[in-house]
């Protein structure tokens, strides 16, 4: 996924109210931009980090700029816009990069499903295969090379796991897809120390037949591309 128009850079002052971020532009202007991330963003929002932001063509937006990437003092790149994860996975499937998810003739997004009234991120269909339900999660929490999900307690994520378990138990293909969007992450685990209920459910999901697929992205100010398969460590 290429950024067009190109991203602009600034220095992070602070993130607050979950969706807002104050930045300082190279000319000294202070600007408030939108932050599309409801997580804790641990290690991603340190004051002084370089912020890379996009500009919307929608003139009606109160905050036309969106925080896309963080560049940390030690050189790590992080995609902080969680809305990009689904787009990246769709792009990678269509490009043939995700070998585990090839051979389907139809791809749809945001399809209603499940007993808890959820929407599946990606639905793959083909007349010769079971339907494939894919829930996408963005991983940005880093601790000594280890990536963790979630970075905060997530009742919504727990609901998604219950839905995936139900899909698997009904004999259809069920996939939890971790998009690793932090250049410093070397492997991924469920964050037992942050959300023990999510950890318990992910173990149940694996036992029920839910597949866990992990791909890491290459990131820079020009583009993001999911291109490196990684293992999930329970």
From Swiss-Prot:
The lineage of its organism: Bacteria, Pseudomonadati, Pseudomonadota, Gammaproteobacteria, Vibrionales. This is Sugar fermentation stimulation protein homolog. It comes from Photobacterium profundum (strain SS9). Pfam families: SfsA (PF03749), SfsA_N (PF17746). It comes from the Bacteria. Belongs to the SfsA family. One of its GO terms (molecular function) is DNA binding. InterPro entries: SfsA, SfsA_C, SfsA_N.
């Amino acid at each position: 996924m290429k950024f067009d128009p190109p991203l602009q850079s600034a220095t992070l002052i602070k993130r607050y109210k979950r969706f807002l971020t104050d930045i300082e532009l190279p000319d000294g202007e202070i600007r408030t931009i939108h932050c599309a991330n409801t997580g804790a963003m641990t290690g991603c929002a340190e004051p002084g980090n370089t912020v890379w932001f996009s500009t919307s063509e929608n003139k009606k937006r109160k905050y036309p700029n969106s925080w896309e990437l963080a560049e940390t003092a030690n050189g790590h790149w992080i995609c902080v816009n969680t809305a990009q994860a689904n787009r990246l996975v769709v792009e990678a499937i269509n490009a043939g990069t995700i070998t585990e998810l090839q051979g389907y003739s139809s791809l749809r997004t945001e399809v209603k499903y499940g007993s808890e009234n959820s929407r599946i991120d990606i639905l793959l269909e083909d007349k010769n295969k079971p339907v494939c339900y894919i829930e996408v999660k963005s991983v940005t929490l880093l601790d000594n090379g280890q990536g963790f999900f979630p970075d905060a307690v997530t009742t919504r994520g727990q609901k998604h796991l219950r839905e995936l378990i139900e899909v698997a138990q009904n004999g259809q293909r069920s996939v939890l897809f971790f998009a690793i969007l932090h250049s410093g992450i070397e492997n991924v685990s469920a964050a037992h120390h942050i959300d023990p209920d999510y950890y318990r459910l992910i173990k149940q999901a694996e036992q029920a037949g839910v597949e866990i697929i992990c791909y890491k992205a290459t990131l820079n100010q020009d583009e993001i591309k999911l291109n490196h398969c990684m293992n999930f460590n329970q």
